[in-house]
Amino acid sequence: MGKIIGIDLGTTNSCVAVMEGGEAVVISNAEGNRTTPSVVAFKGEERQVGEVAKRQAITNPNTIQSIKRHMGTSHTVDVDGKKFTPQEISAIILQKLKKDAEDYLGESVTEAVITVPAYFNDAERQATKDAGKIAGLDVKRIINEPTAAALAYGLDKGEDHTILIYDLGGGTFDVSILELGDGVFEVVATAGDNRLGGDDFDQKVIDYLVAEFKKENGIDLGKDKMALQRLKDAAEKAKKDLSGVTSAHISLPFITAGEAGPLHLEMTLTRAKFEELTADLVERTMEPTRRALKDAGLTPSDLDKIILVGGSTRIPAVQKAIHDFTKKEPFKGVNPDEVVALGAAIQGGVLAGDVKDVVLLDVTPLSLGIETMGGVMTKLIDRNTTIPTSKSQVFSTAADNQPAVDIHVLQGERPMAPDNKTLGRFQLTDIPPAPRGVPQIEVKFDIDANGIVHVSAKDLGTNKEQSITIQSSSGIDEAEIERMVKEAEANAEADNKRKEEAELRNETDQLVFATDKAIKDLGEQVEEADKEKAEAAKEKAKTALEGSDLEAIRTAKDELSAVVQELTQKVYAKMAEQQGAEGAEPQAEAKQDDNVVDAEFEDLDDRK
C-alpha cells in the first residue's frame, strides 16, 4: 500500500505533508518552498500553478485566485470561452501538490486526506472530494482544519487538555474546541465564517489606498484592473510587514497616468491605521469564538491552551483580541501555515495503520433536517453532533390519499426552511391511499466520517424505500466528474509533453551554439570538408527548431551531435599526432638525463 498524503487545500496557500519514520513532514514543492500559492493561470494551452502563476497575475487576466471561496456553488470561471468549475480549478492545484509529493517520495501517490474548514457545509465538502477525484486522488477522508491542527499539536501529549483552535486563513475562519486525552481527539464544538479571512484584511487596505489616491489625484484606481492587481500585492505585503514593524511604506511608481503625465502612489501605512481599518473584521472572529465556547458549555478559564492556525493569525491585533478574551497567551509552538497539512498527514497515517492509538471524533458543524408542514425546518441531527452518526424519525402525510411525499433536505440553524441551505430533494412515491396522518414514513439521516450526508425515506407499511446521497449543489454528476478526470490526465500529459519539447529545443539550441563556438575556436585545425559537414548539420538543426515537428528536431539534434563528436575526435587526434612529432627530440635528451639520475639512485641504494 502506497503512502496517504495529507493536503491542506487553502484559499491563498496550500501545503502537502506525509508520514515518514513515524513523523509527519512537510514536502517542499518543485520551487523549494514549503507552501504553494493556490493560484492557477492559463497562457494559451499552458497551465501554470503556484508561485509562477501568482507572479504573472498582474499581466494575465486568466489568473484565478481564492477559488476555495466558491467551492460547492454553481460559480464558474470563464477562460477564453471555456468554463471551469471551482472543482476543476482546485483539481489543478491538487495535481501540482500530488506531483510534488510523487517527486519527493519517488513513487506514485493515489490516496490523500484533504482538510476543509470546520464550517464547510455538505456541498462544499462534496465539491472538495470531487476535486480530489478529478486530480486522480482517492480521497480517503475529509477532515476539519482545526481538528487536523489539534492532531499535529497533540499527538505526543500524554495529559488531558481542553484546547481552543482559532483558525484564520486566507478566506475562511473557524474556531473549534477539542478535548484531548489518551489518544482521543474529541471535537466538542465548532463555529465559523466561510466568508472571512486574510483576503478581507487585504481588501480593507486596498479600499483605503484607492480612496486616498482618489482624494489626492481625482482618479479611481478601482476601475483599473492592472493597478488593482499591483495594489493587491502591495496590500498583502504591507499587512505582512506590519506584523513585525509599526509602519510600512507602500511605493507603486507609474501606477496610472493623468493629464500631466505618469502618477505614482507613495504612502505610509501605520500599524495603528491598519488596526483601525480592520477592527470590524477582528471583531467578526470573536462572535463565533464566543458561540463555540457557549455550545461547549465552557468559559475561557476552562481552556488549557489556545492554538493559532492560519497565516492571518500573525496579525498582532488578532493575537491581542484572542488574548484579551481568553486571558491566555496563545501557544506559538506550531507553524500556522503548515500545521493543518501535518495533521492531515497524521490522519493519513492513522488510516494506513502507520499511526496507532489515535481516535479522531469530529462533529457536524450545522444542524440537518427536513422541511415539514408550514415550511418549518424539523431538525433530525443537531449541530456539534459527533460523526459518524445516524438518526431517524417517523413522519406522515399531510393530506388524505396522498400518493407521494417530497423530502426536502436542509442544513442550517434557522427555524424556517427557506432560510436554510438546501442540500437536496427526492420523492417517495406509491404510498397506498390512506387518510392523512396514517402512513408511517421513516426518514433516516446518516453522516459518514467525511461529514457527507446520506438520507433515506421508507414507507413502513409497504417497506418501499428511496434514498439519496447528497451531491454538491453545483450538480456535478459522476459522468461529468469522469470527463474532468480524463481531461485533467490529458492536461498532465500535455504539460509533460510541453516540458519535453522545451527541454529538447533548449538542448538543440545549445548544441547549435556549441558547434558554432567549436568551429571558431578550432579555426584552421578543422578541415574544410569537416567544417562544411558540421555547418550543414547545424543549419538543418536551426531549420528544424523553427518548425513544430519534434521528431525532426530530435533527428537533426542527433545528427549534429554525431557530426560534432566526429569533428572534435579528428581534431584531437591530429593535435596528439603533432605533439608526438614535436616532443620526440626532447624525449631523447630526457632519456640521457634519466640514465644519469638512475645511476645516482643505484649508488645510493648500494650504500644502504
Swiss-Prot record:
Modified residues annotated as Phosphothreonine in this record: 172
Gene (UniProt): dnaK
Cited PROSITE patterns: HSP70_1, HSP70_2, HSP70_3
One of the record's GO molecular function terms: ATP-dependent protein folding chaperone
HAMAP family: DnaK (MF_00332)
Basic and acidic residues composition-biased segments: 490-508
Species the sequence originates in: Exiguobacterium sp. (strain ATCC BAA-1283 / AT1b)
InterPro entries assigned: ATPase_NBD, Chaperone_DnaK, Heat_shock_70_CS, HSP70_C_sf, HSP70_peptide-bd_sf, Hsp_70_fam
Superkingdom as given in the UniProt entry: Bacteria
Protein name, as recorded: Chaperone protein DnaK
Keywords: ATP-binding, Chaperone, Nucleotide-binding, Phosphoprotein, Stress response
Homology family: Belongs to the heat shock protein 70 family.
Low complexity: bias regions: 576-587
Bias kind Acidic residues: ranges: 595-608
NCBIfam families from the UniProt entry: PRK00290.1, prok_dnaK
Region named Disordered: 490-509, 576-608
Biological function: Acts as a chaperone.
Expression triggers: By stress conditions e.g. heat shock.
